[in-house]
Amino acid sequence: DVYGICIDMGRPGVGAYLRDVEKVAMAVAAAGVRFASPKETPLAGVMTDIRSGKIRDDILDVHVLSVIIEGTVKREQLGSVLEAIKSVEKRIDTVFSLGIVSMLSDDDDRPLMETLTRHGIPLPNRGKVNVGLGKPLFSG
């Protein structure tokens, strides 16, 4: 079982340097995040090592409007990822938001909420529900 992770860095008027994006990507990779492939996300296309989150040296000083770090993490490693994000946020000069993607289960995501609380992350007061209309459900 895994959670989807998306870290949306930068905003209009603020942006983000890829150097800061690399710091976050490498921190969460070391904590267990596995990044989406270059076919799935543009950021992976500029990584020299998709396992570590290392970005090409020649573009680290590029300033972008925004960029999303996307991947997955095993449920039992989410706490480590949250701690990595809290640690690296002090070393970057931009804003970011964290998204966690979870399939609703019989336990109403109590383990997710407990993990967030245990690591000092405020519980969300809103969410997005995709009911799967328009596409067949995954049968894989």
Question: Where in this protein do the model-derived segments appear?
Answer:
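Long, contiguous binding/interaction regions
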Residues: 1-4, 13-32, 50, 57-64, ...
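Residues forming the flavin
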Residues: 7
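Ser/Thr-rich, low-complexity intrinsically disordered terminal regions
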Residues: 34-58
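C-terminal interaction module
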Residues: 67-69
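Helix N-cap motif at beta-to-alpha junctions
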Residues: 71-78
